[in-house]
Regions:
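C-terminal substrate-recognition "lid" of short-chain dehydrogenase/reductases
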Residues: 73-76, 88, 168-197, 202
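Catalytic loop of short-chain dehydrogenase/reductase
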Residues: 92-114, 119-128, 140-141
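Substrate-binding pocket helix/loop in short-chain dehydrogenase/reductase
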Residues: 51-53, 60-62, 160
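The beta1-alpha1 cofactor-binding region of Rossmann-like NAD(H)/NADP(H)-dependent oxidoreductases
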Residues: 15-25, 58, 173
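Active-site loop of short-chain dehydrogenase/reductase
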Residues: 35-38, 83-95, 128-131, 193
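Short C-terminal tail/terminal secondary-structure segment
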Residues: 50, 180, 191-227
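Alpha-helical segment proximal to the catalytic Tyr-Lys
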Residues: 81, 124-128, 188
Length: 227
């Protein structure tokens, strides 16, 4: 962002996405100074901590739901409604594969499932206003959040990699490529869709009862059963 700030057409604003008043102030202050707002990416959210339901407080639940789902709702309400009035725009909401499959991050999974449903609903509401609304559901992605540099002991990523048919982490570049595509005119007929960018994680979930994923060796598919 430091480099981009030097560009004449780049601006940064700080606001709390769960505060509708703050977002409205940003819109009202800059809508006449900036070019037409034509794109919105809702990606803000607090990192979840895996816990059992018995160990999850109401405050912890609310914090995750607010940051991932309520923040997306308010951002879409403020900026998406503005796009609808101007009959032009594209919105990309960030969901997750956990929005489809359960995991020990209860509030996070519920919030990301809600983002998928919200995306579908808004895409229908604003279709005739020429505002497209889609979502991206990333899988395990190589970010500092997953393996921070300050971690003394390197995290064993083997269980994660073994759950991905491509046997690797997604990159932020791959996720951003999908986001840019959905914001562009190249996806002009796509709305109400959630694109999974997960290396096949969700598609491969049903293979584990049969021994796991196939490998490259001939006749070595794990689902092969000897007589």
């Amino acid at each position: 962002l430091g480099k981009l700030k030097k560009e004449d057409n780049f601006y940064t604003f700080q606001a709390d996405v769960v505060d509708e008043h703050q977002l409205k102030k940003v819109l009202l202050k800059y809508k006449d100074e900036l070019p037409k707002i034509s794109g919105l990416v809702c990606s803000a959210g607090k990192a979840p901590i895996p816990k059992k339901i018995e160990d999850t407080s109401i405050n912890e639940w609310n914090e995750i739901i607010q940051s991932h789902l309520t923040g997306t709702f308010i951002s879409c309400k403020v900026f998406g409604s503005y796009m609808a009035v101007n009959s032009y725009g594209a919105i990309v909401n960030i969901s997750s594969v956990v929005g489809y499959n359960s995991g020990p991050v209860l509030a996070y999974g519920a919030a990301k499932a809600g983002v998928i449903n919200l995306t579908s609903a808004l895409s229908t509401q604003w279709a005739k206003d020429n505002v497209r609304v889609n979502a991206v559901a990333p899988g395990w992605t190589d970010t500092p959040l997953l393996r921070p540099k300050e971690r003394k002991n390197k995290r064993d990523l083997t269980p994660i990699l073994n759950s991905v048919p491509q046997n690797r982490l997604m990159t932020t570049k791959e996720i951003s490529n999908v986001i840019c595509f959905l914001l562009s005119s190249n996806s002009s007929s796509i709305t109400g869709t959630t694109i999974k960018c997960d290396g096949g994680t969700l598609s491969g979930a049903g293979w584990f009862p049969y021994g796991g994923f196939p490998n490259k060796e001939k006749n070595s598919s794990p689902y092969y059963l000897e007589e």
